[in-house]
């Protein structure tokens, strides 16, 4: 069972198995913001900046949680989530978006994602979602 502790970053520190977090985004801002927390948790961080790299990584490595920017899948849109689920149906997928668009959120949630994160909600919500997804993936 996971026990919540608070690390130096002030974010929850989960006592669970370490895992690998894959962040799929352009620009790398999210991975830079999460790097300290991920290291503090004992997790590994992998990053990709395109759909091809994402799919290749999922086929070749054990990934515990995927955090993907909603804009990453280029022309594939929501179909990309179905393809990812086809590779690993139990993979917790967290989608990040800059704006809260209810129609987009509804379509994405129908794909069976773990969490839909609007960036303006702040990093604490995202960190909590990643922590919960890591716990789920280790069960």
Which residues does each PLM region occupy?
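Acidic catalytic/metal-coordinating carboxylates
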Residues: 50, 76-79
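The feature encodes the CheY-like receiver
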Residues: 73
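Active-site residues of response regulator receiver
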Residues: 66-70, 97
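Alpha4 helix (beta4-alpha4-beta5 surface) of REC/receiver domains from two-component response regulators
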Residues: 79, 99-117
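Short amphipathic alpha-helix used as the core "switch/output" element in two-component signaling
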Residues: 78-89
């Amino acid at each position: 069972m996971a026990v919540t502790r608070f690390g130096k970053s002030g974010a929850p520190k989960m006592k669970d198995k370490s895992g690998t977090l894959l962040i799929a985004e352009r620009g790398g801002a999210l991975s830079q913001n999460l790097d300290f927390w991920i290291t503090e948790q004992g997790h590994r961080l992998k990053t990709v900046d395109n759909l091809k790299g994402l799919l290749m990584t999922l086929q070749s490595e054990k990934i515990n949680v995927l955090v993907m920017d909603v804009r990453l899948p280029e022309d594939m849109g929501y179909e990309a989530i179905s393809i990812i689920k086809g590779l690993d149906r139990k993979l917790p997928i967290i989608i990040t978006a800059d704006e809260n668009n209810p129609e987009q959120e509804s379509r994405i949630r129908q794909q069976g994602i773990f969490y839909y994160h609007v960036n303006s909600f702040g990093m604490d919500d995202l960190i909590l979602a990643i922590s919960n997804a890591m716990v789920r993936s280790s069960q």
